[in-house]
Regions:
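Walker A/P-loop
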Residues: 138
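Primarily NTPase-proximal linker/entry elements flanking Walker-type ATP/GTP-binding cores
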Residues: 1-135, 143, 147, 175, ...
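Hydrophobic face of alpha-helices
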Residues: 2-5, 47-50, 142, 190-193, ...
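P-loop NTPase switch/communication element
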Residues: 122, 149-192, 327-328
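Alpha-helical transmembrane segments of multipass membrane proteins
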Residues: 147-148, 286
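P-loop NTPase motor-domain active sites and their immediate coupling elements
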Residues: 40, 72-105, 110-118, 123-124, ...
């Protein structure tokens, strides 16, 4: 390392940059040399020497960090002669992983100093991953998902996976954490994303009814009910004033009576909500099939889903501007770039160059949540056989409870013609037996989105099952049929 430091100093002097190497930080793949230039040296002069130094040092790639944040030094990252593999098992057996208390802990790998790097997906709150073929992107994605599965039970986290390549995520099929079998049909993938948006809206309505703001406080409140510390009838506090939203036709609809207890409080049985991780392995393919619908769903989830406990991981090997649009990029502050083929791809994913100089095979740059400086990490490695062993073990613990209604097509042509919908009869039974009609009540009882529940209520009004909203009753609809 000292010899390399002397050689680096010598080559820099040949280009008119004088100074000395003060510190050396060896890592599993690259070694960082902290170089302190002489006073008066322009940083821009050093930053443009990456390719020249790579040739002079006979190195595969040289990445320059100019300057190092908080220091009057410039960092030179030179590849090691012998790369070290970072096994995922080694990362997961570290004490720091055992003590990691995040809601969605993710193991990433080791930094350039050889220290384990962990993150919490719930704090990110969404992650954008890009990398060219052979960069290690798919293995890195497997590492992230496997680390979550190793830490969290199906009651704590559920997963919805979209795999246009068909083979990349199939190993996870059938584990109890899955909401659905891995989705490979792109048209069904759009339906799955729309369901995630509906589920987000449903959860926010539940939070509003319970007087909470996010999934964490909601689940803590549920725990109090289950432990007997909080009465069920106190779970939903009184709400004053008109609570409304727009239905599918743009009309204002009252969600619940304007005064008094939420009508569902007596019959409502609170349950803890699991976090949901939505994984899209090749986002570019999905955008080619249904760009408009997909982008709108991803943007809504990225903007609002954090507090509801729904988090998105998008991965693509083609980080062009037509795939990672400005709307998507603006809502994914945490991003990971494996090696890309050109500078423009690095600019698209990270907002700056650098990813084109990575070494591949798990070498990556990361923008941590809430930070502006890039962090270089070498991703942990997990083999396909190791992932299969983990998934086989999970399958032995129990069968998945699939929610096949996720992939049922939505009827967006208005309420007409939905009387053949099997949910319609269930909705009629719900309001008839309850003796009142509330869109939020139908939402919760049928586990559907707000728009779907609003359409069912409109159809029941057309069929004479319920009356129109009454302003005197605070928007309450009269049920015109008896209990079933």
């Amino acid at each position: 390392l000292r010899r390399n430091a002397e050689l680096l100093t010598e080559k820099l002097a040949a280009y008119g940059v004088r100074g000395r190497v003060d510190e050396i930080h060896p890592g599993p793949v690259v070694t960082m040399y902290e170089f302190e230039p002489q006073s008066g040296t322009k940083v821009s002069k050093i930053a443009g020497l990456a390719d020249d130094l790579a040739m002079a040092l006979a190195a595969q790639k040289v990445r320059i960090v100019a300057p190092i944040a908080g220091k009057a030094r410039v960092g030179f990252e030179l590849p090691n002669d012998i790369r070290q593999t970072v096994p995922l098992r080694e990362i997961l057996e570290d004490r720091r992983w055992e003590k990691h208390g995040g809601a969605l802990p993710v193991a990433l790998g080791k930094d350039i100093g050889g220290q384990p790097v962990y993150a919490d997906l719930s704090k990110m709150p969404h992650l954008l991953v890009a990398g060219a073929t052979g960069s290690g992107k798919s293995v890195g994605l497997n590492v992230m998902l496997t680390s979550i599965l190793a830490k969290k039970t199906p009651d704590e986290v559920r997963m919805l996976m979209v795999d246009p390549k068909v083979v990349e995520l199939q190993v996870f099929d059938g584990i109890p954490h899955m909401l659905l079998p891995v989705v490979t049909d792109m048209k069904k993938a759009a339906l799955a994303l729309r369901w995630a948006v509906d589920e987000m809206e449903r959860r926010y309505q539940m939070f509003a009814d319970a007087g909470t703001r996010n999934i964490d406080t909601y689940n803590r409140r549920v725990e109090r009910v289950l432990s007997g510390d909080l009465a069920v009838d106190k779970f939903m506090p009184k709400r004053k004033g008109k609570v409304s939203a727009q239905d599918a036709n743009g009309q204002e609809v009252l969600l619940d009576p304007a005064d008094g207890e939420s009508p569902d409080a007596e019959n409502f049985e609170p349950e803890k909500l699991p976090y949901i991780v939505v994984v899209v392995d090749e986002f570019a393919d999905l955008m080619m099939v249904a760009a408009k619908d997909v982008e709108a769903c991803i943007a809504r989830l990225a903007q609002k889903a954090r507090a509801s406990g729904i988090h998105v991981i998008l991965a693509t090997q083609r980080p062009s501007v037509d795939v990672i649009t400005g709307m998507i990029k603006a809502n994914f502050p945490a991003r990971v770039a494996f090696k890309v083929s050109q500078r423009q791809d690095s600019m698209t994913i990270l907002g700056r160059s650098g990813a084109e100089h990575l070494l591949g095979m798990g070498d990556m740059l990361m923008i941590p949540p809430g930070a502006s400086d890039l962090q270089r990490v070498h991703a942990a490695y997990v083999s396909e056989d190791e992932v299969r062993v983990v998934c086989d073990f999970l399958r032995e613990q129990g069968d998945p409870e699939y929610q096949q209604e996720i992939l049922k097509p939505r009827e967006d042509d208005g309420p007409g013609g939905e009387s053949d919908d099997p949910l319609y009869d269930k909705a009629v039974a719900v309001v008839a037996n309850a003796g009142y009609c509330s869109i939020s009540h139908v939402q919760r009882q049928l586990s559907v989105g707000y728009n779907k529940a609003a359409k069912l209520v409109e159809l029941m009004e057309q069929e004479g099952v319920v009356g129109p909203p009454s302003s005197k009753a605070g928007g309450r609809r009269e049920v015109l049929v008896g209990p079933l």
